[in-house]
A protein has these predicted regions:
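Cysteine-cluster motifs in flexible loop/terminal segments that predominantly coordinate metals
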Residues: 183-196
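ATP-dependent adenylation/nucleotidyltransferase module used to activate substrates
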Residues: 1-177
Length: 196
């Protein structure tokens, strides 16, 4: 079994915590970030910073501009997060984002002979984003195992989601219990830019 894992790393608190947990579990981590036209582009600096801080094998940034075809508050400067009112799906929802991110992560994982993908979906995301739900992640895992060379060869992709049952508050204070790494608390973007 390969000890490699692809970590979807936005640079935010959840994905950095997920990276720390993967490292603590002994995985050789390959981090994957996405430049999808998001307003919080500075998180990509944080993703690179934490990839280096955790001694990841490789860090890649994949460019895809969701802003060309969606009006999510995360990608469209004219859409406000505050415009959400009573909507069940938040204005920050980017259509099919995790489907695309997970597909690309699985493609890279297959290329490096890995079956482990980590995503930092959590309980807060679960409440509003359809592609952060446990049911979605279970179904995606089944689908990717049916539609990949890896699955056809009898190996099983595992979509690890260690934070799916946690709130952001709990995630903020989680401490990795193992000996492989000490969780580095996510820093402010200014600290990231000023630290070598």
């Amino acid at each position: 079994m390969s000890n490699k894992a692809v970590i979807i790393l936005s640079g935010g608190m959840d994905s950095v915590t997920t990276l720390a947990l993967a490292k603590d579990r002994g995985y050789d981590c390959y981090t994957l970030s996405f430049n999808y036209g998001q307003k919080s582009i500075s998180e990509l600096d944080a993703a690179l910073y934490y990839s280096k801080k955790y001694h990841c094998i490789k860090h890649k940034v994949f460019d895809i501009n969701f802003g060309d075809f969606t009006d999510s508050a995360l990608t469209n400067s004219s859409t406000s997060v505050l415009d959400n009112s009573e909507a069940s799906i938040p204005k920050t929802y980017v259509p099919m984002r995790n489907i695309i991110f997970l597909s690309i992560a699985c493609s890279w994982a297959e290329n490096i002979n890995s079956t482990n993908i980590f995503i930092g979906a959590n309980a807060i995301d679960y409440s509003g984003y359809p592609d952060c739900r446990e049911e979605f992640l279970d179904s995606f895992e089944k689908m990717i195992n049916l539609g990949s060379k890896t699955g056809s060869e009898g190996k099983i992709f595992n979509i690890h989601r260690p934070l799916v049952e946690m709130s952001k508050i709990r995630t903020k204070w989680i401490d990795t219990p193992g000996k492989n790494t000490k969780l580095i608390k996510p820093a402010s973007i200014n600290e990231v830019k000023n630290d070598d």
